[in-house]
Regions:
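Polar-ligand-bearing catalytic/cofactor-coordination segments
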Residues: 3-9, 21-316, 330-410
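Flexible, low-complexity linker/boundary loops enriched in proline and small hydrophobic residues
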Residues: 16-17
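N-terminal signal-anchor/signal peptide hydrophobic helix marking the start
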Residues: 316-326
């Protein structure tokens, strides 16, 4: 693996992510947002409230990322040798235990920040769930995460031991397969652990969904209502699943709290994702980037775990190398994720344009974007750096600009 220096490997991975984003970008159906004045849509009080809330939440989120990454770095640098020696007596079972244990540890070290963020969400009225119910959700999500991490730890050690110098190649295949399985099974296996889903009953909303789907020529799969209101006052909708698990999911507080014409626009936006196969587009991006990304992760992992035999063809590594692998995968994902977010913002903007074309209702579109920003306490114009690094959707003002541009084309 010494053939390529690490800086060159990083450059190749970043180039692969950028090339995949460029290749898969929407080539039509986008609308350049019209210039709009934020003060024409939001009062000074509303802007200050959103900034006060979101600025601290962003800092807490970044702090949580630093804490979790720092914890992995500490584990990779100074792993508890006695514990890992015991796990190494039965390497594969030990790897599963190590994966689960690392996952639980990361939840625990991040819990104070998560609780702080939730406390602030309660203060602004976004969170509705009691603390005991929230704690139960933490236990559930920790258990699910530990199970997934156990499988991940087991597979990682199998690949590292079997393909000592080139485990990045089969790892790329595993990551893509995991992405497909996750999108396919998560809506029917994991989501029901946390929420109750019911098929949207006959009525105006279901009629609108099916009518819009027919007009758009989209196989909508099934339409579900989820009891999101038991956790939050925020409203949302999303598409998920593949094949028989394909679905459109509407928050119950979206259906109950917004006018019918605005709900139609949200539905039309989600149909735009299905019309353009955006979930499959995301999987294709992953497939294109995974080889370079896992090669980058392997080089990082070998740098972190060399003293424990990682990268040495004469050594069969044990579970003690897993913190180094986890840290490397985390850093690679953070570096390459911004390119994925660029693509996500583009397909979201195209889905907005699709919704406007389908409903022909720009006034309702603009009103919805304003209303959802107020309800979800969204900063209409967040700082450009956090937007570039983390945002998966256009900003509120960009989306309002799309609506205004559609209504008044040049």
């Amino acid at each position: 693996m010494g053939r390529l220096r690490l800086p060159l490997v990083i450059l190749v991975a970043v180039a692969a992510a950028g090339a995949a984003t460029f290749l898969l970008r929407p080539r039509s159906g986008l609308i350049d947002p019209a210039p709009v004045d934020v003060e024409a849509y939001f009062t000074a009080f509303q802007l200050d409230r959103a900034e006060d809330y979101r600025s601290v939440q962003r800092l807490l989120g970044i702090g949580g990322l630093v804490v979790s990454t720092g914890t992995l770095a500490l584990l990779a640098w100074r792993p508890p040798r006695g514990l890992f020696e015991r796990l190494g007596r039965r390497p594969l079972l030990g790897a599963a235990a190590a994966g689960a244990g690392i996952s639980v540890l990361l939840v625990m070290v991040g819990l104070p920040i998560d609780a702080w963020q939730r406390s602030r969400a309660l203060d602004v009225g976004l969170a509705t769930q009691s603390w005991p119910d929230w704690a139960l959700d933490v236990v559930k999500s920790t258990a699910v995460g530990a199970g997934v991490a156990a499988v991940g730890g087991l597979l990682a050690l199998v690949l590292v031991r079997r393909f000592r110098r080139n485990w990045w190649a089969p790892a790329a295949v595993v990551i893509v397969a995991f992405g497909v399985i996750t999108i396919w099974l998560w809506p029917v296996v994991i989501d029901p652990i946390f929420n109750d889903f019911e098929k949207l009953p006959p009525g105006p909303v279901r009629q609108d969904v099916l009518g819009l789907a027919d007009e758009a020529g989209v196989d909508v799969g099934e339409v579900y209502r989820v009891d999101a209101s038991r956790r939050t006052t925020a409203a949302n909708a999303y598409v998920g699943g593949l094949g028989h698990s394909k679905r459109v999911v509407l928050y119950d507080n979206l259906i109950a709290g917004f006018p019918r014409d605005e709900v139609r626009l949200v539905v039309a936006h989600e149909l735009g994702h299905q019309k353009h196969n955006d979930l499959s587009r995301g999987l294709l991006w992953l497939a294109l980037v995974a080889p370079a990304g896992t090669f980058f992760a392997q080089r990082l992992a070998e740098a972190f775990g060399r003293r424990y035999g990682l990268g040495d063809p004469a050594v069969k590594p044990g579970p003690i190398v897993l913190p180094a692998v986890a840290l490397a995968v985390t850093l690679a994902s953070l570096l390459l994720g911004s390119a994925s977010n660029v693509l996500s913002r583009q397909v979201e903007a195209r889905a907005d344009a699709f919704a406007l074309d389908l409903t022909q209702d720009p006034a309702a579109f603009v009103q919805f974007e304003r209303r959802i920003a107020l309800r979800n306490v969204i900063d209409p114009e967040p700082p450009w750096l956090t937007r570039f690094l983390f945002a998966t959707h256009p900003t509120t003002m960009e989306r309002i600009g799309i609506g205004e541009a559609w209504e008044k084309p040049e």
